[in-house]
Amino acid sequence: MYYTKEYLKRAHREIDTIFRVLFPEHGMAVREEQIMLCHEMLDNLLGRNIALCDAGVGIGKTYAYLVACVLMRKYSLLAEGCSPYEQRPVVISTSSIALQKAILTEYIPFLSRILQENGTIQAPIKAVIRKGKEHFVCDERLEQRIVAIEEKNKNALQKEALLSLKEHYDMDEVSNLSGFDRRMVSVPKFCSGDCPKRGSCRYQQYLERSRDHEMFIQICNHNYLLADGYHRLQDYRPLLKDY
Protein backbone atom coordinates (compact mmCIF):
# COMPACT_ATOMS: atom_id res chain seq x y z
CA MET A 1 0.00 0.00 0.00
CA TYR A 2 2.87 2.39 0.85
CA TYR A 3 4.49 1.85 -2.54
CA THR A 4 1.16 2.29 -4.33
CA LYS A 5 0.64 5.68 -2.66
CA GLU A 6 4.20 6.73 -3.48
CA TYR A 7 3.77 5.76 -7.12
CA LEU A 8 0.53 7.74 -7.25
CA LYS A 9 2.29 10.83 -5.89
CA ARG A 10 5.10 10.37 -8.38
CA ALA A 11 2.64 10.03 -11.26
CA HIS A 12 0.95 13.31 -10.32
CA ARG A 13 4.33 15.04 -10.05
CA GLU A 14 5.10 13.86 -13.57
CA ILE A 15 1.87 15.46 -14.80
CA ASP A 16 3.07 18.81 -13.45
CA THR A 17 6.50 18.33 -15.01
CA ILE A 18 5.03 17.47 -18.40
CA PHE A 19 2.59 20.39 -18.56
CA ARG A 20 4.58 23.03 -16.67
CA VAL A 21 8.08 22.25 -17.96
CA LEU A 22 8.23 19.96 -21.01
CA PHE A 23 5.33 21.42 -22.97
CA PRO A 24 6.40 25.07 -22.45
CA GLU A 25 9.91 24.10 -23.60
CA HIS A 26 8.25 23.14 -26.89
CA GLY A 27 6.27 26.37 -27.23
CA MET A 28 3.05 25.35 -25.51
CA ALA A 29 1.27 27.49 -22.92
CA VAL A 30 0.54 26.36 -19.37
CA ARG A 31 -3.22 25.82 -18.99
CA GLU A 32 -4.42 25.20 -15.46
CA GLU A 33 -7.72 23.61 -16.53
CA GLN A 34 -5.81 21.17 -18.71
CA ILE A 35 -3.57 20.18 -15.80
CA MET A 36 -6.52 19.78 -13.42
CA LEU A 37 -8.31 17.61 -15.99
CA CYS A 38 -5.28 15.36 -16.40
CA HIS A 39 -4.95 14.89 -12.61
CA GLU A 40 -8.66 14.02 -12.38
CA MET A 41 -8.44 11.52 -15.21
CA LEU A 42 -5.34 9.84 -13.83
CA ASP A 43 -6.93 9.40 -10.40
CA ASN A 44 -9.96 7.73 -11.91
CA LEU A 45 -7.99 5.57 -14.33
CA LEU A 46 -5.74 4.24 -11.58
CA GLY A 47 -8.73 3.83 -9.29
CA ARG A 48 -10.64 2.03 -12.08
CA ASN A 49 -13.54 4.41 -11.65
CA ILE A 50 -15.87 6.14 -14.10
CA ALA A 51 -15.44 9.89 -14.51
CA LEU A 52 -17.60 12.30 -16.51
CA CYS A 53 -15.54 15.43 -17.18
CA ASP A 54 -17.08 18.54 -18.72
CA ALA A 55 -14.17 20.05 -20.66
CA GLY A 56 -14.64 23.26 -22.61
CA VAL A 57 -13.28 23.95 -26.07
CA GLY A 58 -9.64 25.00 -26.15
CA ILE A 59 -8.40 23.74 -22.79
CA GLY A 60 -6.31 21.01 -24.40
CA LYS A 61 -8.28 17.96 -23.33
CA THR A 62 -6.68 15.68 -25.94
CA TYR A 63 -3.23 16.00 -24.38
CA ALA A 64 -4.83 15.83 -20.92
CA TYR A 65 -6.32 12.39 -21.50
CA LEU A 66 -3.35 11.10 -23.51
CA VAL A 67 -0.89 11.99 -20.73
CA ALA A 68 -3.22 10.47 -18.12
CA CYS A 69 -3.43 7.23 -20.12
CA VAL A 70 0.33 6.98 -20.61
CA LEU A 71 1.01 7.53 -16.91
CA MET A 72 -1.77 5.13 -15.94
CA ARG A 73 -0.07 2.33 -17.86
CA LYS A 74 3.37 3.21 -16.56
CA TYR A 75 2.41 3.35 -12.89
CA SER A 76 -0.08 0.50 -12.86
CA LEU A 77 2.79 -1.65 -14.15
CA LEU A 78 5.14 -0.40 -11.42
CA ALA A 79 2.57 -0.74 -8.65
CA GLU A 80 1.02 -4.05 -9.66
CA GLY A 81 3.76 -5.97 -11.43
CA CYS A 82 2.67 -8.09 -14.36
CA SER A 83 -1.10 -7.99 -13.84
CA PRO A 84 -3.37 -8.22 -16.91
CA TYR A 85 -4.77 -4.75 -16.20
CA GLU A 86 -1.82 -2.67 -17.31
CA GLN A 87 -1.47 -4.72 -20.49
CA ARG A 88 -4.92 -3.70 -21.69
CA PRO A 89 -5.15 -1.08 -24.42
CA VAL A 90 -6.87 2.26 -23.96
CA VAL A 91 -9.76 3.03 -26.32
CA ILE A 92 -10.28 6.63 -27.43
CA SER A 93 -13.65 7.16 -29.09
CA THR A 94 -14.43 10.34 -31.02
CA SER A 95 -16.99 11.30 -33.65
CA SER A 96 -14.48 13.42 -35.58
CA ILE A 97 -12.46 11.68 -38.30
CA ALA A 98 -10.13 14.69 -38.40
CA LEU A 99 -9.41 14.33 -34.67
CA GLN A 100 -8.81 10.59 -35.04
CA LYS A 101 -6.18 11.28 -37.70
CA ALA A 102 -4.67 14.13 -35.68
CA ILE A 103 -4.34 11.94 -32.58
CA LEU A 104 -2.55 9.28 -34.63
CA THR A 105 -0.30 11.49 -36.76
CA GLU A 106 0.27 14.61 -34.62
CA TYR A 107 -0.58 14.33 -30.92
CA ILE A 108 0.85 10.88 -30.21
CA PRO A 109 4.12 11.25 -32.19
CA PHE A 110 4.85 14.59 -30.48
CA LEU A 111 4.00 13.30 -27.00
CA SER A 112 5.92 10.08 -27.57
CA ARG A 113 9.02 11.96 -28.71
CA ILE A 114 9.23 14.44 -25.84
CA LEU A 115 8.44 11.83 -23.17
CA GLN A 116 11.14 9.53 -24.54
CA GLU A 117 13.66 12.37 -24.70
CA ASN A 118 12.84 13.25 -21.10
CA GLY A 119 13.05 9.62 -19.95
CA THR A 120 9.44 9.49 -18.77
CA ILE A 121 8.82 6.52 -21.06
CA GLN A 122 11.30 4.10 -22.61
CA ALA A 123 9.47 3.05 -25.79
CA PRO A 124 7.31 4.83 -28.37
CA ILE A 125 3.57 5.11 -27.81
CA LYS A 126 1.89 2.90 -30.40
CA ALA A 127 -1.62 3.58 -31.67
CA VAL A 128 -3.98 2.43 -34.40
CA ILE A 129 -7.29 3.62 -35.84
CA ARG A 130 -9.97 0.91 -35.66
CA LYS A 131 -12.96 0.85 -37.98
CA GLY A 132 -15.33 -1.57 -39.67
CA LYS A 133 -14.20 -4.05 -42.31
CA GLU A 134 -16.27 -2.24 -44.98
CA HIS A 135 -13.50 0.39 -45.00
CA PHE A 136 -10.84 -2.12 -46.07
CA VAL A 137 -9.92 -3.96 -49.26
CA CYS A 138 -10.38 -7.69 -49.72
CA ASP A 139 -7.37 -8.69 -51.83
CA GLU A 140 -9.22 -11.61 -53.43
CA ARG A 141 -12.22 -9.48 -54.42
CA LEU A 142 -9.91 -6.69 -55.66
CA GLU A 143 -8.11 -9.10 -57.97
CA GLN A 144 -11.43 -10.33 -59.35
CA ARG A 145 -12.69 -6.78 -59.87
CA ILE A 146 -9.54 -5.69 -61.73
CA VAL A 147 -9.90 -8.67 -64.09
CA ALA A 148 -13.58 -7.82 -64.62
CA ILE A 149 -12.87 -4.25 -65.80
CA GLU A 150 -9.86 -4.98 -68.00
CA GLU A 151 -11.81 -4.86 -71.27
CA LYS A 152 -14.35 -2.26 -70.15
CA ASN A 153 -14.39 1.45 -70.98
CA LYS A 154 -14.25 2.54 -67.34
CA ASN A 155 -13.89 6.14 -66.16
CA ALA A 156 -10.14 6.83 -66.07
CA LEU A 157 -10.09 8.42 -62.62
CA GLN A 158 -12.19 5.64 -61.13
CA LYS A 159 -10.01 2.99 -62.75
CA GLU A 160 -6.86 4.64 -61.43
CA ALA A 161 -8.41 4.79 -57.96
CA LEU A 162 -9.31 1.10 -58.13
CA LEU A 163 -5.81 0.09 -59.23
CA SER A 164 -4.28 2.20 -56.45
CA LEU A 165 -5.92 -0.14 -53.93
CA LYS A 166 -3.09 -2.56 -54.65
CA GLU A 167 -0.97 -0.12 -52.62
CA HIS A 168 -3.62 1.19 -50.18
CA TYR A 169 -5.72 -1.32 -48.28
CA ASP A 170 -7.65 1.42 -46.42
CA MET A 171 -10.16 2.71 -48.97
CA ASP A 172 -10.64 5.96 -47.04
CA GLU A 173 -7.15 6.94 -48.21
CA VAL A 174 -8.12 6.79 -51.90
CA SER A 175 -9.94 9.54 -53.82
CA ASN A 176 -12.28 9.04 -56.79
CA LEU A 177 -13.17 5.45 -55.89
CA SER A 178 -16.73 4.79 -57.04
CA GLY A 179 -19.31 3.61 -54.56
CA PHE A 180 -19.92 0.51 -56.68
CA ASP A 181 -16.23 -0.43 -56.77
CA ARG A 182 -15.99 0.17 -53.05
CA ARG A 183 -18.82 -2.29 -52.41
CA MET A 184 -17.37 -4.82 -54.83
CA VAL A 185 -13.89 -4.95 -53.27
CA SER A 186 -14.54 -4.35 -49.57
CA VAL A 187 -13.91 -7.08 -47.02
CA PRO A 188 -17.09 -9.21 -46.87
CA LYS A 189 -19.14 -9.64 -43.72
CA PHE A 190 -17.88 -13.21 -43.37
CA CYS A 191 -14.41 -14.22 -44.59
CA SER A 192 -13.93 -17.75 -45.89
CA GLY A 193 -11.52 -19.84 -43.85
CA ASP A 194 -10.10 -21.34 -47.05
CA CYS A 195 -9.58 -18.03 -48.87
CA PRO A 196 -6.49 -18.37 -51.12
CA LYS A 197 -5.31 -14.91 -50.06
CA ARG A 198 -5.67 -15.48 -46.31
CA GLY A 199 -1.94 -15.95 -45.70
CA SER A 200 -1.08 -12.60 -47.31
CA CYS A 201 -4.33 -10.74 -46.61
CA ARG A 202 -3.61 -7.12 -45.73
CA TYR A 203 -6.79 -6.82 -43.70
CA GLN A 204 -5.87 -9.83 -41.56
CA GLN A 205 -2.38 -8.36 -41.09
CA TYR A 206 -3.97 -5.09 -39.97
CA LEU A 207 -6.06 -6.98 -37.40
CA GLU A 208 -2.98 -8.80 -36.11
CA ARG A 209 -1.09 -5.51 -35.69
CA SER A 210 -4.10 -3.99 -33.94
CA ARG A 211 -4.22 -6.85 -31.43
CA ASP A 212 -0.53 -6.68 -30.58
CA HIS A 213 -0.07 -6.02 -26.85
CA GLU A 214 2.23 -3.08 -27.64
CA MET A 215 -0.54 -1.32 -29.60
CA PHE A 216 -1.53 0.66 -26.52
CA ILE A 217 -4.03 3.18 -27.90
CA GLN A 218 -6.99 2.09 -30.03
CA ILE A 219 -8.78 4.99 -31.73
CA CYS A 220 -12.30 4.55 -33.09
CA ASN A 221 -15.61 6.30 -33.60
CA HIS A 222 -18.58 6.00 -31.26
CA ASN A 223 -20.43 3.55 -33.51
CA TYR A 224 -17.50 1.12 -33.49
CA LEU A 225 -17.23 1.28 -29.70
CA LEU A 226 -20.98 0.67 -29.32
CA ALA A 227 -20.80 -2.21 -31.82
CA ASP A 228 -18.05 -3.78 -29.70
CA GLY A 229 -20.29 -3.49 -26.65
CA TYR A 230 -23.16 -5.11 -28.56
CA HIS A 231 -20.90 -8.00 -29.61
CA ARG A 232 -19.95 -8.58 -25.99
CA LEU A 233 -23.58 -8.55 -24.83
CA GLN A 234 -24.48 -11.13 -27.48
CA ASP A 235 -21.42 -13.29 -26.70
CA TYR A 236 -20.00 -12.61 -30.16
CA ARG A 237 -16.30 -12.13 -30.72
CA PRO A 238 -15.45 -8.57 -29.54
CA LEU A 239 -14.23 -6.07 -32.11
CA LEU A 240 -11.67 -4.68 -29.65
CA LYS A 241 -9.32 -6.33 -27.20
CA ASP A 242 -10.36 -6.11 -23.55
CA TYR A 243 -9.72 -2.52 -22.50
Whereabouts are the PLM-identified features?
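A substrate-engagement module of RecA-like helicase motors
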Residues: 2-20, 29, 76-218, 222-226
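N-terminal pre-P-loop "Q-motif" helix
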Residues: 28-45
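Contiguous, well-ordered alpha-helical segments that form the cores/surfaces of helical PPI scaffolds
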Residues: 39-40, 63-71
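Walker A/P-loop
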Residues: 47-67
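DNA-processing P-loop NTPase/helicase core
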Residues: 229, 234-236
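SF2 helicase catalytic motif II
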Residues: 239-243
